[in-house]
Amino acid sequence: MTRDQAREKVIFALDTGEFAHVQYWAETLSDKVGMYKIGKQLFTACGPAAVRMIQKFGGEVFLDLKFHDIPNTVAMASVEAARMGVKLFNLHALGGYEMMAKTVEALDKEFKGGDRAKVLAVTILTSSTEETLKDLGIEHTVPDMVVRLATLARKAGIDGVVASPREIPLIREACGSDFLIVTPGVRPSFAALNDQKRVMTPAEAVKAGSDYLVIGRPIGDAPDPAAAAELILGEIVAG
């Protein structure tokens, strides 16, 4: 794998509420990462302006708002997300088949079957454990729930899933090679685990079959973020 191919796989998590930070990261990491993840904190603080700032510097956006509501509400919110020109956005698979299928239907109608943002379904959050599921009344194991939700998402026409690296082989087997897998819970060899439980290194996740890697603090908290990002690219290329 080349460095450019590795770069395209890296999504930097913009874990900030400050608009000024958006431009800083867009400039600092423009040749180090392929995409920027805008989550709830940043989007609540800055709104679509954060998306436009990334796009101004030629960056792609993964809008990580994890929609979960009644089907029509999620479908209409999804259309608005796609209209912003983001590359990826997501919703919760736990919202159910109808919510996901209606979203795909609304997007295909809006974009007439042409190019549009890819929709990802969140399976089980990487901070969740078996105990977390039991607290919610779910008796299945984490891997079983991930596969169940990924399969349901695929059936509804969703483009891929957000899932822990540990579940990549199971998802690939259940959903096929053309189903996108975006993996948080990726920690390079030089970084701490923080609050994510089911993790892999970038090289391990890519080897397992991940299409995109979401990485935040190992880059953002590093003394030299650009150098940290370059180290990660090196890990991926080296395999």
From Swiss-Prot:
Substrate binds at residues 15, 37, 64-73, 126, 187, 196, 216-217. Keywords: Decarboxylase, Lyase, Pyrimidine biosynthesis. PROSITE patterns: OMPDECASE. Homodimer. Pfam families: OMPdecase. The active site is at K66. SUPFAM superfamilies: Ribulose-phoshate binding barrel. SMART domains: OMPdecase. GO terms for cellular component: cytosol. The gene is pyrF. It is an enzyme of class 4 (lyase). GO terms for molecular function: orotidine-5'-phosphate decarboxylase activity. Its EC number is 4.1.1.23. The keyword Lyase applies. One of its GO terms (biological process) is 'de novo' UMP biosynthetic process. It catalyses: orotidine 5'-phosphate + H(+) = UMP + CO2. Belongs to the OMP decarboxylase family. Type 1 subfamily. Pathway: Pyrimidine metabolism; UMP biosynthesis via de novo pathway; UMP from orotate: step 2/2. This is Orotidine 5'-phosphate decarboxylase.
